[in-house]
């Protein structure tokens, strides 16, 4: 379960960072 959670986070974090900072 933790492995899947980390895998999802690695995909979500860059997208959120991109949306917030407008740096893509």
Swiss-Prot record:
Subcellular location: Secreted
Disulfide linkage: 18-24
Keywords carried by this UniProt record: Amphibian defense peptide, Antibiotic, Antimicrobial, Disulfide bond, Secreted
Keyword Hydrolase: no
GO terms under biological process: defense response to bacterium
Tissue: Expressed by the skin glands.
Organism superkingdom: Eukaryota
InterPro entries xref list: Antimicrobial_frog_1
Keyword Magnesium in record: no
GO cellular component: extracellular region
Chain segments annotated as coiled-coil in the UniProt record: none
Family that this chain belongs to: Belongs to the frog skin active peptide (FSAP) family. Brevinin subfamily.
Function noted in UniProt: Has antibacterial activity against the Gram-positive bacterium S.aureus ATCC 25923 (MIC=3 uM) and the Gram-negative bacterium E.coli ATCC 25726 (MIC=24 uM).
Protein name: Brevinin-1PTa
Record organism: Pulchrana picturata
């Amino acid at each position: 379960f933790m492995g899947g959670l980390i895998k999802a986070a690695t995909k979500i974090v860059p997208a959120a960072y991109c949306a917030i900072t407008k740096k893509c």
